[in-house]
Amino acid sequence: MAALDDLMASGGLADKVVRIDDNLMRLQWGSAFVIVGISGSAVVAIAPLFRAVPRGREPAFYRRLLEHNAYMGGIASFAIQSDGWVVLHAGRPLKGMDGQELATMIAGVGRFADQFDDQLIAEFYMDQPEATNQTDASHVSVPETD
């Protein structure tokens, strides 16, 4: 998609992405990854962190996500998708967005995802590793970001 390519290039991220398809790109941030795409008239950045909410610890987990949302101050927020995935995401209208703004949005999602995935795994997923996104991806080559 030309608009996304142009934004990534002007934001200095073009050499750090792996194209998933015409509408989606992936970037790696430490142990987390961010999927970026244009959906309709919006640009979204999503870091899929967990396949499911931790069994037996739901109330404490939800509280922790809300606390993390408050800490991030609106830069990004946790959500639970209809398929059960726990994601960290941010988005805004495409109109008027420039590459630097996109890079800032992606970096916010990436850095917070990299910070919080390890904390949440340690607190909630040590006995449920199958619910994390920490699978063997040795066959996938994804450029590192700062």
Question: Which residues fall in each region the model found?
Answer:
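Short, highly charged C-terminal tails/helix-capping segments
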Residues: 120-146
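Amphipathic, soluble alpha/beta structural segments
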Residues: 27-33, 80-106
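Charge-rich, low-complexity N-terminal segments
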Residues: 1-33, 71-73, 79-81, 146
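Short, internal acidic amphipathic alpha-helical interface segments
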Residues: 46-89
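Short N-terminal mixed-charge amphipathic segments
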Residues: 26-52
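Short acidic, gly/pro-rich beta-turn/loop elements at beta-sheet edges
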Residues: 37, 55-57, 98
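Ampiphathic alpha-helical segments that act as solvent-exposed interaction surfaces
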Residues: 62-71, 92-125
